[in-house]
Amino acid sequence: MFQDVLVITVAAGRGGDGAVSFRREKFVPKGGPDGGDGGRGGSVYLRARGSVDSLSRLSKRTYKAEDGEHGRGSQQHGRGGEDLVIEVPRGTRVFDADTGELLADLTEEGQTVLVARGGAGGRGNMHFVTPTRQAPRFAEAGEEGEKRRLRLELMLIADVGLVGYPNAGKSSLLAAMTRAHPKIAPYPFTTLSPNLGVVEVSEEERFTLADIPGIIEGASEGKGLGLEFLRHIARTRVLLYVLDAADEPLKTLETLRKEVGAYDPALLRRPSLVALNKVDLLEEEAVKALADALAREGLAVLPVSALTGVGLPALKEALHALVRSTPPPEMPKPVPRKEVQAGVEVVPVAEGVYEVRAPEVERYLARIKGDLMEAAGYLQEVFRRQGVEAALRAKGVRAGDLVRIGGLEFEYIPEV
């Protein structure tokens, strides 16, 4: 089953905790702390593969990378979690499902993007030894990995997009010009999903065709199947309008261009040709009259028959010439996010009571594992390094005032 839009959740692995451990070997004096570090959590990546043709292969709705292992004594570090690589079709656009932000456009074979970063492993207690802190009974816990919802939207990569009514013969034309084998039947809406085919002009020259489900009048208002799949012609260099010569082709062309323009006005400026199909059903004079009338609409018209092969060589040459002379359309590109360093804010909440809002400092606090009293000296270093001490002084906080930060409360004692 073809699927071109999908929402999934990706979760990176949590970092392993650092260990609180002390060397206790017989006849080894001054063993000291020897807690090892936790391993980094695995990250989640998306990778474009030409061998994957639909998002339907992503059977799960949540994808999680492996957690990092915890550190152990004797300075043994935990193993890092294994990264998770999810393969998606080439042409997949990746959006943040909650914000709508475009994160990546995976068009090249093997192109890879990081979508959820694994949490850092915590440091073991051997890292917190100082001349005045010889036996720290605390360590760092591992960080949580990133978690986010992604909206994956597949936009096929092709040179030429076939646009037409249901049963206009688009699939027959695709089959006649390429080695593709789309479903073909004498009733409307036989094509329920896009099909790709490669037109071989010579041993070195080729181009690709994309056939999408037929468009009907009112498609831009949600009728039929075609509008749902029009995104698949957004990347094409050239549009080929396929018309049934025996079924009001002039009116059909007008309707098709109206619906395409309602979806995206820029598509009307895309280089285009008209394939007047099924000319084997009409007399030569009637075909010429129709072709002349269609040409007055400003597009080149080529009478063809997918059934008999009439006009197909000329159509191939005309399409190939247009493809070679037309650059790929410009698509919106992801905008790199700028990392904004969060500052420190001191907010009075009552007389002599202050709340400190500092995300980076709160991150340090959340990761302390073990004896918080023993970690007080380390936290004071963090406060000074991150600007908390300076912010408290600037706000006029006095000795003995109550300070809250990251779920902790303490009496403020100014540094001497």
From Swiss-Prot:
One Pfam assignment: MMR_HSR1
Protein's recorded name: GTPase Obg
PROSITE patterns registered for this protein in UniProt: G_OBG (PS51710), GTP1_OBG (PS00905), OBG (PS51883), OCT (PS51881)
Keyword match Lipoprotein: no
Described purpose of this protein according to its UniProt entry: An essential GTPase which binds GTP, GDP and possibly (p)ppGpp with moderate affinity, with high nucleotide exchange rates and a fairly low GTP hydrolysis rate. Plays a role in control of the cell cycle, stress response, ribosome biogenesis and in those bacteria that undergo differentiation, in morphogenesis control.
Organism: Thermus thermophilus (strain ATCC BAA-163 / DSM 7039 / HB27)
GO terms of molecular function: GTP binding; GTPase activity; magnesium ion binding
Biased composition (Gly residues): 32-42
Keywords noted in UniProt: Cytoplasm, GTP-binding, Hydrolase, Magnesium, Metal-binding, Nucleotide-binding
Family, per entry: Belongs to the TRAFAC class OBG-HflX-like GTPase superfamily. OBG GTPase family.
Residues covered by region (Disordered): 25-44, 62-82
OCT domain sequence ranges: 336-414
Cofactor dependence: Mg(2+)
Phylogenetic classification of the source organism: Bacteria, Thermotogati, Deinococcota, Deinococci, Thermales
TM stretches of this protein: none
Principal location listed in the UniProt entry: cytoplasm
Domain OBG-type G per the UniProt entry, residue ranges: 158-324
Residue ranges occupied by any Obg domain in the UniProt entry: 1-157
